[in-house]
A protein has these predicted regions:
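Short aromatic-cysteine micro-motif
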Residues: 424-520, 524-525, 529-537
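Residues within well-ordered beta-strands of beta-sheet-rich folds
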Residues: 197-199, 251-253, 431-433, 518-520, ...
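C-terminal, surface-exposed recognition/capping segments
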Residues: 525-621
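Residues that flank catalytic or metal-binding motifs in active/ligand-binding sites
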Residues: 152, 246-248, 426-428, 517, ...
Length: 621
């Protein structure tokens, strides 16, 4: 950051920044070429011009190589014996276009370089992971024609040895530059080296100084500096201005999980405190200096608008089914905020506006703040575009892949841990796996023979369901050999269901995720805890032998809560019918307890043990 009242020599700054950027010249000559005096003097061309006036950053003008003259020879003009005709080219360099940004790993798919990241508690049951991406520069191919600079007013100044030699003020219409009537179209200039300044009228030229600040930022605020040798020649010379922003552009992208994380109108602003960020810049062409000064009052830079909710791609999740896991909103190309070189993003915060009526996960965003102060000390540079990507997580506890750590996603993923299960009952330390056991054709049977049974069992009615729930015996039924009935003589030796292939649903967990005696088929008790956690107020309501009431998902989010909780952890929600570890005494123990969980309802039930369906594994910590 450049401290207040510190000065940088323009040429030093020009030669230091952007020395590797390559651009392509576009010719757009305008009428009324200007007649210049000349004398017998020639010099080498400096071969550098700046993309951004405020930083005086140099960009080498080239199509195929790193060196190319900024002055090009044209057709013979009508110059007199002591003058040379010149014309100007105007082209737009612009910023990089926004690319798709992943949400599971925040930088995945990002076209750019992550320069800072942080995590924070956003309040109201939400967490945020922030990454700042320096967007990739547009790639310019040899011979490619750049788009014209926007039609607007521009000023061109020519300085030599700190003295202004010429000034033109006029309007560029996309093809031609027309000088205003009150400015001479012909000014005397001797051949030699000149520093040309060109800038849109977002920048002001007064009392020999060029000034601009936070209030002047715009996608159309453009400038350039070109060091040029005016030759002693009869042919027209063309001075090329490839215009870039004198600001750093900062856009916002907010990611969420599920296909509809965002609803309603959402907008906001970057806020700052007095004396924390650069507020104005003053260029002194006569002395070759640049001075930055801090903003002296608290302020904010509002984004014009965000897009509405944008759905992510359809992704394969399980059993050949697809789902949309993510969604996002973003400030479009023309809706960024423009900050000065040297600004540090950790001196800013993002606040949703007071008139924002929208929601994230159906939580109101009005006046809420997403902090940036934990970001690494990242300094913005002139002419570059940045995207602040903030991914919003619904706060919940998960078990991580060390099988010890329990906590919310954001701080633990920042440590390099990966979630393996969602905590659904903290008192009993019960966790539900993030996905089903890998699918097999026709599903997995509870048992491949109806004579295979548990020792302890209940009738298939509401009282029997409640008694079965109260046992919380999923792990025991899976791993304790003494829970399996051997009276029929079918399993005299391998009574542990997880180790017996005659119990396919249990056997699938024998070495699940490389762990033994950890993962298990949940009993009715574990399922009861999970359904209550996920929004079913009373999972036993309406249960009978003949019918089961379809119980709607509660919570303000409904089934979307399941989508958010599982998608944000890299899994997927329940959407099938599943085995429980318990069986029913009714019908000669031929049926086992089941849970049906669809996008609109859930309930307990029962099915023949030889039917095939899904297994959602559970684990305790």
């Amino acid at each position: 950051m450049h401290p207040k009242n510190s000065y940088l020599l323009i040429n030093d700054y020009v030669n230091g920044l952007y020395s590797n950027v390559r651009v392509t010249e576009i010719r757009m000559c305008y009428a009324n070429s200007l007649r210049l005096n000349r004398e017998d003097m020639k010099k080498k061309i400096l071969n550098v011009f700046a993309v951004a006036l405020v930083a005086m950053a140099a960009v080498v003008n080239t199509g195929c190589s790193n060196e190319s003259s900024l002055v090009t020879d044209g057709q013979p003009g009508n110059a007199g014996g002591d003058s040379t005709l010149v014309s100007f080219n105007f082209a737009l360099q612009g910023f990089a276009a926004e690319k798709t940004v992943g949400t599971r790993a925040l930088a995945a798919g990002t076209d750019g370089r992550v320069i800072a990241s942080s995590v924070a508690d956003a309040g109201n049951g939400l967490e945020v992971m922030t990454e700042v991406v320096e967007d990739a520069k547009p790639q310019t191919r040899a011979g490619e024609v750049l788009k014209p600079a926007p039609a607007q007013n521009y000023t061109i100044l020519a300085y030599q040895d700190g003295v202004k030699k010429a000034e033109w003020v006029g309007r560029f219409d996309g093809t031609n530059f027309t000088v205003n009537a009150d400015h001479s179209k012909v000014q005397a200039m001797k051949p030699g080296m000149y520093k040309f300044y060109v800038f849109s009228d977002h920048l002001k030229y007064q009392n020999g100084k060029i000034t601009f600040g936070l209030a002047n930022g715009s996608i159309n605020a453009l400038s350039n500096i070109v060091d040029v040798e005016i030759h002693d020649q009869k042919e027209t010379q063309t001075v090329s201005f490839q215009l870039g922003s004198p600001y750093a552009r900062v856009r916002m992208r907010i990611n969420g999980f599920s296909s509809q994380a965002f609803e309603g109108s959402i907008n906001g602003a970057l806020k700052y405190k007095a004396n924390t960020i650069e507020g104005t810049c003053e260029i002194d062409p006569a002395h070759g200096t640049v001075t930055y000064s801090k903003a002296t009052q608290d302020g904010s830079l509002s984004y014009n608008h965000f897009t509405n909710n944008i759905e992510g791609d359809n992704e394969n999740i399980s059993n050949g089914t697809q789902a949309i896991r993510t969604s996002h909103i973003i400030t479009p190309e023309d809706a960024g905020c423009y900050l000065l070189s040297g600004t540090h993003l950790n001196q800013l915060s993002f606040q949703f506006s007071s008139d924002a009526s929208g929601t994230i996960y159906r939580k109101p965003v009005r006046n809420r703040e997403l902090p940036l102060e934990n970001l690494a000390d990242a300094e913005l540079e002139t002419g570059k575009s940045y995207t602040i990507t903030q991914t919003i997580y619904y706060k919940a506890d998960y078990l991580f892949d060390d099988y010890k750590t329990v906590g919310s996603l954001v701080p633990n993923m920042k440590k390099g841990l990966n979630p393996v299960a969602l905590v659904v009952d903290k008192d009993r330390h019960i966790c539900m796996g993030l996905e089903d056991v890998p699918h097999v054709k026709d599903g997995r049977q509870w048992a491949d023979n109806l004579n295979l049974k548990n020792i302890e069992t209940e009738n298939q009615d509401v009282n029997g369901l409640i008694n079965t729930i109260n046992r919380y015996d999923g792990w025991k039924q899976t791993w304790d050999m003494y829970t399996t009935d051997t009276s029929a003589g079918y399993i005299p030796k391998k009574r542990t269901k997880a180790r017996n292939s005659h119990f396919p649903a249990f056997n699938a967990l024998e070495n699940y995720k490389g762990k033994t005696q950890m993962w298990y088929v949940p009993g009715a008790g574990e399922w009861h805890s999970a359904l209550k956690y996920l929004g079913i107020a009373d999972p036993t309501r309406g249960f009978t032998f003949d019918n089961q009431e379809h119980l709607e998902w509660g919570d303000v989010l409904g089934y979307r809560l399941l989508e958010v909780l599982f998608y944000q952890a890299g899994g997927y929600p329940l959407n099938d019918w599943y085995w429980a570890a318990d069986d029913w005494k009714t019908d000669g123990k031929a049926k086992a307890v089941t849970v049906t969980a669809r996008s609109t309802y859930a309930h307990f039930g029962g099915a023949r043990k030889t039917d095939g369906t899904q297994v959602r594994p559970f684990v305790n910590y």
